[in-house]
Amino acid sequence: MSFTDKQEALVNSSYEAFKQNLSGYSVFFYTVILEKAPAAKGLFSFLKDSAGVQDSPQLQAHAEKVFGLVRDSASQLRATGGVVLGDAALGAIHIQKGVVDPHFVVVKEALLKTIKEAAGDKWSEELSTAWEVAYDALATEIKKAMS
């Protein structure tokens, strides 16, 4: 099944909703990650020495990058049917930080919860599926770059 124009539009519109409250949704995203995997705190330089998830420019920049990469994956999937990493160093960075397969599952869950929060009454299974497909394609490419 190919990624449709509608799926791309759903990802784009909910990404814009996410960016409307980047500070709040960034804190929400990392709070969900640490609730699921407290040990993951050490993977993020902007969290490892803090008492908890505190808003910061680094936290917002990283969240915006993660969500932006998934949005870009949606665009690539619709246009070409595949995803190519724009940053070849992503694999090496994830290896250096100690990221392992279960971390991708935790991030996916946190991403979906955050988008659900941002989308509000526009949340739907169709929206969830669009984000899941785009995230899974991105995660697959990052994992390939890690091997």
Swiss-Prot record:
Residues recorded with modification Nitrated tyrosine: 25, 30, 135
Post-translational modification: Nitrated in effective nodules and particularly in hypoxic conditions; this mechanism may play a protective role in the symbiosis by buffering toxic peroxynitrite NO(2)(-). Nitration level decrease during nodule senescence. Phosphorylation at Ser-45 disrupts the molecular environment of its porphyrin ring oxygen binding pocket, thus leading to a reduced oxygen consumption and to the delivery of oxygen O(2) to symbiosomes.
Gene3D superfamilies: Globins (1.10.490.10)
PROSITE patterns: GLOBIN (PS01033), PLANT_GLOBIN (PS00208)
Assigned keywords, A-Z: Cytoplasm, Heme, Iron, Metal-binding, Nitration, Nitrogen fixation, Nodulation, Nucleus, Oxygen transport, Phosphoprotein, Transport
Binding site for O2: 62
Residues binding heme b: 45, 65, 94, 97
Chain positions found as Phosphoserine: 45
InterPro entries: Globin, Globin-like_sf, Globin/Proto, Leghaemoglobin-like, Leghaemoglobin_Fe_BS
GO CC field: cytosol; nucleus
GO BP terms in the entry: nodulation; response to cadmium ion
Disulphide-bonded residues: none
Protein known as: Leghemoglobin 6
Organism: Medicago truncatula (Barrel medic)
Gene name for this UniProt entry: LB6
